[in-house]
């Protein structure tokens, strides 16, 4: 389960890089202070994936902490990025992560 999660996170990063969604500079420090789900008021969906979701999941993996067993990110990404032509390609690793977590106790 943990190895599969790591692989899906790596695939998400690779996909974001291939789609030119991966950024070299993080958002301003204030953007990370958001209390809204997905930091919707301070970050774009792809920024949130790169700078919040992926690092938090990696930190859980590295520390041996329990992974979330209920994840629902794809509906937000679908709505926030509905105009993005390669949306389905981006959703593939996200849906795989959701299915893995939602079908297993971590």
UniProtKB/Swiss-Prot annotation:
GO terms for biological process: single-species biofilm formation. InterPro entries: UCP006257, YqcC-like_dom, YqcC-like_sf. It comes from Haemophilus influenzae (strain ATCC 51907 / DSM 11121 / KW20 / Rd). It holds the Pfam family DUF446. To the N-terminal of E.carotovora exoenzyme regulation regulon ORF1. The C-terminal part is colinear with YqcB. It comes from the Bacteria. The lineage of its organism: Bacteria, Pseudomonadati, Pseudomonadota, Gammaproteobacteria, Pasteurellales. This is Uncharacterized protein HI_1436.
